[in-house]
């Protein structure tokens, strides 16, 4: 079994679908169940992607609103399980200060568990908007929810266009 812990707002990071695709392929190739522990808002994107792209992968979804819940997960972990913790770098939307304590938590509570720490791509050409298909077949488009998300979106658009600087009076 692959147990994946995903932070809230991870769906807004550039590398979200890349790591999700790699884990889905891994689950498909070794024919094992993937259990995602994540915030309900992030869960709908993972569910939508898995339902659209990887219907044959067995998945479970568990709501996890706080990072403190990661300690209780150690009780149900076996030696043949793999724990994947999706993290983020400071300054990015899915980063939480609780992530700074992961090394201590993982070394103390998950000694006999295979662990993978994932730092997804956070640079590159993100999609300007995320589109997935809801289970009812309708397209769902999400725009950034935070002010910082709108600023980053505007900054990317500005950088994607070629602007020329001209002196006053010259064309």
Report residues per predicted region:
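Intrinsically disordered or low-complexity boundary/linker segments at protein termini
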Residues: 1-67, 78-82, 88-94, 102-171
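Repeated scaffold domains used in trafficking and secretory/extracellular systems
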Residues: 68-72
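PAPS-dependent sulfotransferase catalytic core
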Residues: 75
